[in-house]
Amino acid sequence: MHHIGKRIFGFCLTAVLLTSVLPGALIANAAEANTENTASQENTGFSDGCEEVDFSTLSDDERISSVEDYMEFSGNGAPLVGSSAPSLPEECDNSTNENSIYCPPIGDQGGVYGCACWSATYYNYTYTAHRAYGIPTTENNIFSPIWTYNLSNSGYIKGGSNGPRNYNIIRTMGALTVEDVPAINSPYPEQVVFDWHAENGLWKKALRNRLTSYGYFTPEAYVEGYNTDINTPVPATGTPVTSADDSDLAALKTAISNGEVLGFNSFIYSWDEIKIKSAPGVDNRFVGETVVRGCKDTEGGHGMVIVGYNDNIWTDINGNNKVDSGEMGAFKIANSWGTWNGNNGYYWIAYDAMNKVSAVSGAPSYPNRQPGIDTVSTIKVEPKKYESDVYLKYVLKSSERANTHVYVTAINKADRSEYVSKLVPPYGLDDYANYVDIVEDHSYRGTVTADYGEMYYDLNNVIPDIDIASLNDYDWEVKVVDKTNNGKPLSIIEVKFVDDTTGGEYDLLDGKTYTINGSSKVFSTSNVTFPFSADVKVSPSSIHTLEEVRITALTKGGNAPFKYQFELEKDGSKTMLEPFCNNFECYKRLNAAGDCTIVVTVKDTDGNTTVARKPITVNQTKITALTPDKANASVGDSIVFTPQVTNLAPSFDGTNFRYTVTKDGVSEQFFADFDKRFVWTPEEGGTTL
């Protein structure tokens, strides 16, 4: 307090921080879910069982038609190096550079018709997953090609597969390492290539190892002479690659330079192989190694992976012992026929071999020449937890798994929208019409007699981000179908939801078993009681004293209507914020600074109670100083007062500040301007507070 004369005055001014009632909007985002999830590809007669990919069946997200498409597909993955060929390094070999620690050794598929599985699972997924997680590849953590082969070979000992089947299996069902499913290279005894390994929780274990997405470089991304609408060459063209720095190579080389390995198909029995020669001004480190200069025909369809490229390797395509235009550059590929073939299991494929028509003058003429690299694929693996811990477990017994179909349907209780997944597998082998007449039926364990299969399916394949709390937002149905009435029944032993978080199991069969033959059975959650639980949401996320906070109770399970109670717990004692009421949210100002806990108690109509707790920190808002712009003033002078405040809520502005002027026991209140300051002009002298 100051005493002032008639013209000079002192002051003591009080600034008070007011509160603002500005509740934020609560926005609920409906989860997008996968719709029917099936995989069906036609066998095109590839002799190694590697089937062509029909580009017309790929979604837009699975088609990569340019460097820009690849960049978008890669997202937050490996850093991109550029979008044009001149900006790319002249060579990259992911089997020998710093990424080589993720490469599995050259494998040997032997007599197993599973080249697509060795390409997609053994090489591509092992390398990509381990690189994503930063885990070096060892002989024990390689992912098994037999796991995906047995699930995709249609029950035929010479059954083929292709990339999309393998990638879909890994995306939805996961993968197992060779410790669980050895990478055998003989199809005998036949059970080893028919066994689905549906036992001992292996299917649930596999769900830890999945991929996020896959994409195919459509031919226009690297072969401009192709028309992907009809998936065939355009007769008038077919020579897109004319030099080592040709822009038509940019998409593939960008991916490889970013540390990727790429799956692809080729006709390996039609390769025209020669040896790399030496010449001045070229890379002579690989002289004497095998290089493919062209693909003569359509014999021996085979899946492999591209691991690198080198712009400075010379392939004497026309055999004239001179370096001619179009002869520079080659991709390095890894095969799955052991180290005895090629260059210790690797090969070089000349860039020119990608052309339908060679760019090299005097090149050998092949009447049915084919591109040496085709249907190139890439996969994306994110270092995250893929499994939701909420699964459908189903145990079946049959000698004819080909007749089995299983569907799971989630029906949103709010809007009755349906999300259906056809579990792949088991699937009916009639999906692969070309094998129907020659397939031998087997049990889930690959035997010719009836046997059990214990299978798991992650429910996030149906509803993304599902958990045990949100399971009750949907009505669930599981439909099991036995297609043929042939005297070979299907036994339904278990159908249940399993929650690994709590260890809970919710039986849809009521402890019974069922047998069907040529019919179906639907099981629902109508008689299943899921856990009654609650969660708490507090808004805003950063809380300050004097600020109004919205507290929302989120309830799962139980039977409506509900009663809600809100409390604040601090230092071992509780303060009632709102006694039991019908409102699932309340608005309160929390003036006790420090660490505390919001406690919400919910009762359902049956008297069941659940409690949810939310730890929070309330930041103390405090005015630490009030500074005038003048140390002395006279009556009639304007003085600007500026407050210094710590931990001020972001939503607060000048309307939250109030200033009080007191003189001779009489007080007058004023509001601040928008930037929290107060401008005061005294009309008389004296002592003022």
Residue ranges and their predicted role:
Residues 531-538, 621-628:
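Proline-enriched interdomain boundary motifs that mark the N-terminal boundary
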Residues 547-555, 637-647:
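A short beta-strand segment in extracellular, disulfide-stabilized domains
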Residues 556-560, 646-653:
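Short glycine/proline-centered coil/turn motifs in the loop regions
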